[in-house]
Amino acid sequence: SEMCIRDSIHTPQTICGRLNDMLDLARAIDRYIVFYNGPRCGASAPDHMHFQAGNKGFVPLEYLWSDIYREQGEAVYRDGDILLGRLKRWPQSVFFVESGQMDRIAEAFDLLLRLLPVLNGDTEPMMNILCTYEAPVWRLWILPRRTHRPTQYYEEGDKQRLISPGAIDLSGVVPLPRKSDFERFTKEEIVDIFMQVSLTSEETNRICKEWRKI
């Protein structure tokens, strides 16, 4: 099942100043994975603050995490309280944070937020975020990006694909509104779409060098 958790007051969709809310929510409903889609990153209500949540065991990035981390995880920084890392071979740029201390997670996230590029007209870096809580540890995945939609979205005829990837898509489950897209999609095209919307590997490497200075 999936749910939407909206702010009762009309406020913009932004993660700035709201990460602790996300961590608190993940702890309160720890049977679920909580996710955040930026305003131009697949958000269902791009102008109103909300998180979404779904059952754990639904997206591969979460339920296959131990295998994924073993095969392509790379620690960027580690001490007794926190682990910062990234995935080396996921088609989409992925940073992750693991810690049992909310303040350390917030510190690491705030630094990453300052390192990520902000595009013209945006108020925060484009990103999707997923969060789980397995007592006593939170795990946060941050998926930074550089564009809202892939070129395939704007094609015509058989080349068009109606996809605006959000957190769920980039974590390995790609819901499609049209049967024709489902029938034509190839693995290679999905990888291409993920890479189009993601930060480049060069940008990711640069950010990692700075992020480890926490």
Predicted regions and their residues:
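Conserved His + Asp/Glu catalytic blocks
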Residues: S8-N20, L25-A45, G54-I214
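Short, small-residue-biased leader/transition segments that mark boundaries at the very start
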Residues: M3-I5
